[in-house]
């Protein structure tokens, strides 16, 4: 090494203030250059270091060089001190001046970097050079790549003056636009040179990885990628890695890259060609050869998409996730003990590193070529990418937007549980998906990509898939993207299952194209049995099908309903509901989905549960014409519709998409196609007549479907008139959007004593009034609170409106406020007010095989992020958002129309007949049919009413139930207050009725209802 170079290098490194003294070889060179004999001189000028101790630098040298020259000191001593001092002073001044000039130039250069002054003023020289080189290369990368990124103004032939005039505005606009784009990304942008160094990385990397833009720019990408992912990124980008890892690079870079203490600093001449695209040797010690698009590569084209683990300094606590030895985005040091034993070895390797999984969406950038022949591939200048950061797995709550739904899958990608809101977005119900493999649902062309994502998920613990196509149930496909995370048990660190957050990113496409035989008419193994509204569908999918059967409002909470456990294993629900139903002896009609593989979720049908109507299948394919809204119906289902067409609406899941709020007005392609399957069956004619009479004053379902203009006249006369008109239009339409809960259709048509009839009317009427107290916030219809089944006005006696208004609105607004979309199923709102009439005592004796609500903890049954009320599993309260939906006992032999009874019977059905309720997804607890639906036994509440109001087993919608299952005080007070008032009465029907009427002032309403009812009955037998 030349002494001068050594001196300069040492100065650069800041080891010594004076270049020469610290290096024994360099004095000799200096002396020689002055024309003096080097050897004797060395001895002579080392002498004074003993006697004249005034020169500290020389003292450092005395240790090595003093002994040999001891004899000559006396002779030379008088001549040396002055000369040496001058010489040293001169050399120090020269070095100081040189450094000053260098520093000045460096800082001038730093000021020109496109970085804030606060950053450039703090940079050291090496960083300034590194950033400058990166910036210059980036200009080349942008200008010489294909397509060039130079601005049109400068490259076009426009007048210079025009370009000058508009440039400040353009610059300002571009600056702001660029900032906004970067801030709106769920990740950061980067550009990588052909040798694998970062040319640019956006400042937002600090948000997602906690890393510094300045530190990363110009560094090797491999310094920030998990060791196990190096080969993958090299394959994807066409880089050749050096076999040794960090040392010297390929042929020409070995000297520069590996030499000296430079580490990452390679020699500037190691690039193989001027444009940096040479294929042998690079400036990056990790990379032996620059990017090439080899014909042998498994990738075609310039687009790439893959997941890698990148270093992250963001430490998260509470890690229950695995990222192949490094919990994604978690401090491995304190999380290692949670990983599988197989991963511990990897943890030891890099104990202090945290890694976060990112999806890199890359486009390779070729050099612009002027020849159009293109016989050979143009050289690659590098790669541009967006790195989409996955939400750190330690984040336990993710806000679900209107286009997202959650599934839980097993390690073979078989769906274990699906959220009910899937039916808002796709034409599948949750049961359709449960136990299906994603491989069987995914478009054939995307299967390989899905497989790659699957293996990444198992290896890295988290993955964000690229866009892939999920085949629709009835034809065509929908584009999805899925973020999947492996969830580990907090106790034993076993990997339990995979949580997938699915983003629906398109409408249904090519709906008339059949891509797979599963999209054809249903085969025997995928038949929906019409078993009436029992909706045992909830079979195992905790989230029941909200769309097709009465469970559409169910959400996580309800889903949980079925699960004896919290549904953490989605399978046990069905069994439990079924056995309960069977033991109850109620042949509940339920809609069971028989799926391809008889899993506990899907197909357990036993004679106790299925009524005789089981045999009528509903073809699952939708006719192409109305594929978004209607399913073809068999006779049975059409009959059901006659009885309860309104159910179509009642069962449509409450739109989670804001754009679907008006979904009744405009069919949206994302609405489930099975919306109209009305599972129900014939009821006796007397039942129908009475039901018709009861509902005469309500708008008919037809009106609802067609979304009649809002009618605000709630007077009985106008409503009767309206109903009669509807009846004339459709004489067969027997049911209304409101299903009176107590209506005898639910019971054998035995005549009912007048007092019971009045009490029933009273209770029913109250629920209607409550329901109509205010228009639902979701905009589904004017005054309705019937799970969006009603779009027309409902009758509300004038006196009653104010009495409910405040508490109802308050509860409802609380319910809808916390819901992800701000929308809440009206049914949820209902559940807040339901069961206040549970105190009516009926002479009928009830089964007391009930499980107290505590069997399911509120926390278990309440899943954050979903609009679902807590439903106690088969026992306890069934407060589903749909308590309305299914909790009306279906008549024992017959299938009951699937319509939604209006008085939410959460208090009744679930509590009374928990054992008989197959709390299937919808919270459809069907009790034995011999029991009246409108009376809750007085004892039930004494049995279950918990002392602490915050117990959370009331069905406050999940939006109103916090993580601990507590009802916020604002709701608790009113809500529990009502319950205490009405349910702890002593059981005498008369006294409970009188108390209730005093409390709610419903005497006038009752009279009005009775008049309406008797005038409407037109002599039908009671």
Curated annotation (Swiss-Prot):
Residues 239-289, 525-686, 849-896, 962-996 are annotated as: Disordered. Residues 86-139 form the bHLH domain. Residues 578-587, 611-625, 987-996 have a biased composition (Low complexity). InterPro entries: bHLH_dom (IPR011598), HLH_DNA-bd_sf (IPR036638), PAC (IPR001610), PAS (IPR000014), PAS-like_dom_sf (IPR035965), PAS_fold (IPR013767), PAS_fold_3 (IPR013655). A motif (Nuclear localization signal) lies at residues 629-636. Efficient DNA binding requires dimerization with another bHLH protein. Heterodimer with tgo. Transcription factor, master regulator of tracheal cell fates in the embryo, necessary for the development of the salivary gland duct, Malpighian tubules and the posterior spiracles. It may induce a general fate of branched tubular structures of epithelial origin. Functions with tgo to regulate expression of btl. This is Protein trachealess. The gene is trh.
């Amino acid at each position: 090494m030349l002494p001068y170079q050594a001196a300069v290098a040492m100065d650069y490194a800041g080891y010594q203030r004076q270049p020469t003294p610290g290096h024994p070889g360099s004095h000799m060179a200096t002396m020689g250059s002055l024309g003096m004999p080097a050897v004797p001189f060395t001895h002579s000028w080392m002498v004074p270091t003993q006697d004249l101790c005034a020169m500290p630098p020389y003292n450092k040298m005395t240790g090595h060089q003093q002994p040999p020259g001891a004899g000559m000191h006396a002779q030379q001593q008088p001549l040396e001190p002055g000369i040496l001092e001058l010489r040293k002073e001169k050399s120090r001044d020269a070095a100081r001046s040189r450094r000053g000039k260098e520093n000045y130039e460096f800082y001038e250069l730093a000021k020109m970097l496109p970085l804030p002054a606060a950053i450039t003023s703090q940079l050291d020289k090496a960083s300034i050079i590194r950033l400058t080189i990166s910036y210059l290369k980036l200009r080349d990368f942008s200008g010489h790549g294909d397509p060039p990124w130079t601005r049109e103004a400068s490259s076009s032939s426009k007048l210079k003056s025009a370009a000058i005039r508009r440039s400040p505005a353009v610059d300002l606009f571009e600056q702001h636009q660029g900032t906004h784009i970067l801030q709106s990304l769920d990740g950061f942008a980067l550009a990588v040179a052909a040798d694998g160094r970062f040319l640019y990385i956006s400042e937002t990397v600090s948000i997602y990885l906690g890393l510094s833009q300045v530190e990363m720019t110009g560094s090797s990408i491999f310094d920030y990628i998990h060791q196990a992912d190096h080969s993958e990124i090299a394959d994807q980008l066409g880089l050749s890695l050096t076999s040794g890892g960090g040392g010297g690079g390929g042929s020409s870079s070995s000297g520069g890259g590996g030499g000296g203490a430079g580490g990452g600093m390679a020699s500037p001449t190691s690039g193989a060609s001027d444009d940096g695209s040479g294929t042998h040797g690079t400036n990056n010690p990790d990379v032996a050869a620059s990017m090439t698009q080899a014909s042998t590569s498994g990738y075609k084209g310039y687009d790439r998409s893959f997941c890698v683990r990148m270093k992250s300094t963001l430490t998260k606590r509470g890690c229950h996730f695995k990222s192949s030895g490094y919990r994604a985005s978690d401090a491995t040091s304190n999380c290692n003990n949670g990983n599988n034993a197989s991963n511990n070895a990897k943890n030891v390797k890099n104990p202090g590193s945290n890694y976060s999984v990112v999806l890199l969406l890359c486009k390779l950038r070729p050099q612009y070529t002027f020849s159009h022949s293109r016989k050979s591939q143009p050289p690659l200048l590098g790669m541009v990418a967006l790195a989409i950061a996955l939400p750190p797995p330690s984040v336990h709550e993710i806000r679900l937007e209107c286009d997202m739904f959650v599934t839980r899958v097993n390690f073979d990608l078989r769906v274990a549980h699906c959220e009910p809101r899937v039916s808002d977005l796709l034409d599948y119900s949750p049961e359709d998906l449960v136990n299906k493999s994603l491989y069987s649902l995914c478009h054939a062309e995307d299967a390989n990509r899905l497989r790659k994502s699957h293996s990444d998920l198992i290896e890295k613990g988290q993955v964000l898939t690229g866009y892939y196509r999920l085949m629709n149930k009835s034809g065509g496909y929908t584009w999805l993207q899925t973020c999947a995370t492996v969830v580990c048990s907090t106790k034993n660190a076993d990997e339990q299952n995979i949580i997938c957050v699915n983003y629906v990113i398109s409408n249904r496409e090519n709906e008339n194209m059949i891509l797979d035989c599963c999209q054809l008419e249903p085969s025997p193994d995928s038949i929906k049995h019409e078993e009436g509204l029992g909706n045992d569908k909830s079979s195992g999918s905790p989230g029941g099908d909200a769309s097709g059967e009465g469970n559409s409002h169910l959400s996580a909470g309800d889903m949980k309903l079925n699960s004896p456990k919290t549904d953490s294993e989605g399978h046990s629900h069905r069994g439990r509901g079924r056995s309960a139903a069977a033991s109850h002896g109620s042949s509940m009609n339920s809609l069971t989905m028989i799926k391809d593989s008889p899993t506990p979720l899907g197909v357990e049908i036993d004679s106790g549960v299925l009524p005789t109507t089981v045999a009528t299948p509903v073809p699952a394919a939708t006719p192409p014409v109305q594929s978004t809204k209607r399913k073809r119906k068999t006779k049975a289902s059409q009959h059901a519709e006659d009885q309860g067409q309104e159910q179509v609406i009642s069962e449509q899941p409450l739109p989670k998409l804001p754009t679907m709020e008006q979904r009744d007005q405009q069919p949206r392609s994302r609405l489930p196609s099975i919306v109209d399957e009305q599972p129900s069956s014939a009821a006796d004619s007397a039942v129908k007549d009475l039901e018709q009479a009861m509902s005469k004053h309500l708008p008919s379902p037809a009106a609802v479907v067609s979304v009649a203009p809002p009618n605000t006249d709630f007077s009985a006369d106008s409503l009767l008139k309206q109903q009669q008109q509807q009846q004339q239009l459709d004489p067969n339409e027997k049911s209304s959007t409101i299903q009176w809960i107590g209506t005898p259709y639910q019971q054998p048509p035995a005549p009912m004593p007048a007092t019971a009839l009045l009490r029933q009317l009273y209770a029913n009427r109250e629920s209607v009034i409550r329901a109509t107290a205010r228009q639902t916030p979701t905009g589904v219809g004017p005054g309705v609170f019937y799970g969006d089944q009603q779009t027309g006005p409902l009758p509300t006696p004038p006196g009653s409106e104010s009495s409910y208004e405040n508490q109802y609105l308050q509860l409802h607004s609380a319910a809808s406020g916390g819901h992800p979309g701000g929308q809440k199923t009206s049914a949820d709102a209902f559940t807040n007010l339901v069961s206040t009439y549970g105190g009516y005592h009926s002479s009928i004796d009830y089964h007391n095989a009930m499980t107290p609500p505590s069997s399911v903890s509120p926390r278990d049954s309440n899943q954050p992020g979903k609009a679902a009320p807590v439903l106690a599993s088969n026992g306890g309260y069934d407060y589903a958002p749909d308590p309305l939906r299914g909790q009306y006992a279906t008549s024992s032999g017959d299938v009951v129309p699937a319509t939604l009874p209006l008085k939410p019977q959460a208090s009744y059905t679930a509590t009374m007949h928990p054992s008989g309720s197959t709390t299937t997804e919808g919270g459809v607890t069907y009790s034995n049919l011999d029991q009246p639906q409108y009376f809750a036994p007085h004892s039930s509440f004494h049995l279950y009413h918990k002392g602490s109001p915050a117990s959370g087993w009331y069905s406050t919608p999940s939006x109103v139930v916090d993580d601990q299952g507590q009802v916020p005080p604002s709701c608790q007070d009113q809500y529990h207050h009502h319950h205490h008032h009405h349910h702890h009465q002593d059981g005498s029907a008369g006294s409970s009725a009188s108390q209730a009427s005093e409390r709610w002032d419903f005497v006038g309403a009752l009279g009005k209802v009775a008049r309406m009812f008797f005038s409407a009955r037109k002599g039908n037998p009671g």
